[in-house]
Amino acid sequence: MKRLFALVALVATLVGCAGNSEKVAESPAFDKYNSVVYELNIRQATEEGTFAAAEAYLPVLKDMGVDIVWLMPISPIGVDGRKGTLGSYYSIIDYKAINPEFGTMEDFDKFLATAHDLGLKVIIDWVANHTSRDANWWKEGKKDWYVMDEATGLPIVEYDWTDIAKLDYKNEDMRAAMLDALKFWIEKGVDGYRCDVAMNVPGDFWKRAWEEVRAINPDVYLLAEGEETWLHDSDFDATYAWELHHIFNAMAKGGSETKNVAGDGTIKTDAKSVQDLKDYIARDDEKYPAPAMRLMFTSNHDENSWAGTEMERMGDAHKTFAALTFVLPKGQPLIYTGQEIGLNRRLQFFEKDSVVELVDTEYGKEYRDFYKALCAFRH
């Protein structure tokens, strides 16, 4: 452990000169710039897969040093074209409702209240790009709210997501309904959003949405899945550091093929070195000036289920790269469900699974202590 932190400190010193030295004003209510994010997969975090069961785990996350709990989508899942038995969290019927698989709205409210009592912030995953193919909006006859396939008379399918229907942001009524739904959860006390495939939604929509959301809560935390620079111009606080993630994978494996989860196929990543990492940091600093934050990770729900665990992709170096996500300039570290107990298998995505087999083991405790030390180092 000491040798690991010595390496991290050395790398942080070496790359620190490339980091933007501008100090960001901290909110007295919520220091988002120094926060650690935990992605909570409600379905798989416990045997029950419910808000009530996950609520009992919140004190553990607080003790570990987590600041922001990101909930994967919590809305009801479509049946038309459903993948697997339980379906994809990202195929949504109703933006203002709770997936009964996880519990009731009252269960969610209690989960949120407990998190807030512990000093944790809660953000929810928001899917503004598309709905399920049997969403309420579609059933209500709002055909003009969707991008249509003229050949089939049905909404288009993007990538291989055959269970979704693409929304049309040229329609002002649809925009208004989406904005109303975003404000609904902020008014309930949710602290922000992680926005799925945010780069596929027009920037002018995001900018207006965040103006209205921040009028309700100025301290919301807004994370975009994507690393297009214009997302920061659209008032997102943080974007994904995908390029860095692929550099980590390539450094660990000496060059590998990495699946692009956004659907653009398989890309070849050449072998990378520490110099490539330093070059990236300097380039990233220029491309994303402060106060932009970059979400850094060794795993997330996409990587774990489709590309493999951090142990698969990074081998024995996975802890070193995890440590780097906590110290690199402008980085916002992410911990995904199961990482904090050393889970070394892919979680099922469309079926019930669980990470509980390692929770109470010495092996699991070792990883929890590791991440607790990283969180303390960060703070």
Residue ranges and their predicted role:
Residues 50-53, 103-107, 173-177, 201, ...:
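Soluble or luminal CAZymes and related metallo-dependent hydrolases
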Residues 25, 112, 196-290, 294, ...:
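Active-site-proximal helices and loops of the catalytic beta/alpha 8
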Residues 14-16:
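C-terminal motif of bacterial Sec signal peptides marking the signal peptidase cleavage site
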Residues 21-67, 73-188, 208-217, 221:
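Substrate-binding/active-site clefts of carbohydrate-active enzymes
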Residues 36-40, 69-71, 122-124, 193, ...:
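Hydrophobic faces of well-ordered beta-strands that scaffold small-molecule active sites
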Residues 2-8:
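Sec-dependent signal peptide recognition
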Residues 288-313:
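Active-site clefts of carbohydrate-active enzymes
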Residues 70-84, 125-134, 196-202, 225-229, ...:
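Short, solvent-exposed turn/loop segments enriched in Gly/Ser/Thr/Pro and often Arg
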